[in-house]
Design a protein with these regions (language model features):
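Conserved helix-loop-beta element of the AMP-binding
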Residues: 154-158, 175-191, 275-277, 304, ...
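Gly/Ser/Thr-rich phosphate-binding loop
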Residues: 301, 329-332, 342-410
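Conserved AMP-binding/adenylate-forming core of the ANL superfamily
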Residues: 52-53, 70-125, 142-147, 207-213, ...
Length: 417
């Protein structure tokens, strides 16, 4: 083990209160916390902050407004777009103004049923800005599954798009939203729909509103200020898959979650301001919440939002092409994705031709990573492949090698050890 890793481990064991209070200094707090953790009050009691301020506003205020915040890479539409932190602030602020005009405020719930498009990220951060609680539902979930989540979260507003794109298949969302709302006992006040060029959805007034028309209608409204929330106030509700029964809503806090994410970016993934991080997941899952949206932006990094598949969009070289094109420093994906790439390109011809650019490590999670898959990826890429473990209920890695602390220990088939 490295000296840096040993020192960090010892500090966390000898003085956990001090260790996590020190980690919390990576954030801007409206009111500083009184302690790191107490059994009665949880993480950072007394502390108040706003996650949108910490992911967006503070970087602009620090003079990094021109730095790239979000890269949208969509091979299914042939679109690549980059949003600076200043542009992200404007987009998030406009969505926050839209939601505020519909009466959304601190503590209200907003269901987001959207695919991998920038507007999904804008919506999540806009909710956080207002102190509202977002509940992102994986785009394309069947109406009865969406209805269950609507009934549990009881949202004031539902945000959606006219369609999602899965590989070469365009999936209209509005019919599924309409059916879900018909099945649900809870009635939302409004549905706000972003029209994509692939499908134009019909809207039913007065419930349904066009995203861009509402944006134009509220264009003169001031961007709402970031609302401070208590450390243990909810940031979001994310439902487990429901494979073992009724989906269970995991309620994520603000202060502890943000502190853990910022610490993990710096110490597990080795990512800081100006670096490019790519988690090849979906915002409908916990990896997307934590490591597409919140964690990279908390540390001022650039995050990649990828609307595509490991293979077929257009070929098994799409991962390596995206890594090389955007200068990705650390890449996070699931073992299943690598197995799909290997099946289509067993000799890694695309990887050999394209390379891995500036990438320094590949991280795997989401399921068991079999030693054979890890070995193939390490041998073909020449990069350390870090298998680490966590789950929806945790929100960040519980078992991992801390790459930035010089801890590259790994045994194939054993996550984080």
């Amino acid at each position: 083990m490295s000296d840096a890793y040993t020192a960090a481990w010892k500090a966390s064991i000898d003085d956990p209160q001090g260790f996590w209070l020190d980690a919390a200094k990576a954030l801007d707090w409206a009111v500083a916390p009184e302690a790191g953790w107490t059994e009665a009050d949880g993480w950072f009691p007394g502390g108040q902050l706003n996650p949108c301020h910490n992911t967006v506003d503070r970087h602009v205020a620090a003079g990094r407004g021109d730095a790239a915040a979000l890269i949208y890479d969509s091979p299914v539409t042939g679109t690549i777009a980059t949003f600076s932190y200043s542009e992200l602030l404007e987009e998030v602020g406009r969505v926050a103004a839209m939601l505020a005009s519909l009466g959304v405020s601190k503590g209200d719930r907003v269901v987001i049923y959207m695919p991998m498009v920038p507007q999904t990220v804008f919506a999540m951060l806009a909710c956080a800005r207002l102190g509202a609680i977002h509940s992102v539902v994986f785009g394309g979930f069947a109406p009865h599954e969406l209805a269950k989540r609507i009934d549990d979260a009881t949202p004031k507003v539902l945000l959606t798009t006219s369609c999602g794109i899965e590989g070469s298949k365009v999936i209209p969302y509005k019919p599924m939203v309409d059916e879900a709302l018909r099945l649900a006992r809870h009635a939302v006040d409004h549905v706000v729909l972003f029209q994509r060029e692939q499908v134009t959805a019909e809207l039913a007034a007065p419930r349904d509103l066009d995203w861009m028309e509402l944006r134009e209608k509220t264009a003169a409204d001031a961007i709402p200020a970031c609302v401070p929330v208590a450390s243990d106030d909810p940031l979001y509700i994310l439902y487990t898959s429901g494979t073992t029964g009724t989906p269970k809503g995991v309620v994520r806090d603000n202060g502890g979650h943000a502190t853990a994410l910022a610490w993990s970016m710096a110490n597990i993934y080795g990512i800081g301001a100006g670096d490019v991080f790519w988690a090849a997941s979906d915002v409908g899952w916990v990896v997307g919440h934590s490591y597409i949206v919140y964690a990279p932006l908390l540390v001022g990094a650039t995050t990649v939002l990828f609307e595509g598949k490991p293979v077929g969009t257009p070929d098994p070289g799409t991962f390596w092409r995206t890594i090389d094109r955007h200068g990705v420093k650390a890449f996070f994906t699931a073992p299943t994705a690598i197995r799909a790439v290997r099946k289509e390109d067993p000799d890694a011809k695309f990887l050999s031709e394209i390379g891995t650019g500036q990438c320094q490590a590949i991280f795997l999670a989401g399921e068991r990573a079999d030693p054979d898959t890890i070995g193939w990826l390490e041998d073909k890429s020449g990069l350390p492949v870090i298998d680490h473990w966590w789950q929806t209920e945790l929100g960040w890695p519980a078992i991992a090698s801390c790459v930035a602390l010089g801890d590259l220990r790994r045994e194939r088939g054993s996550a984080g050890f």
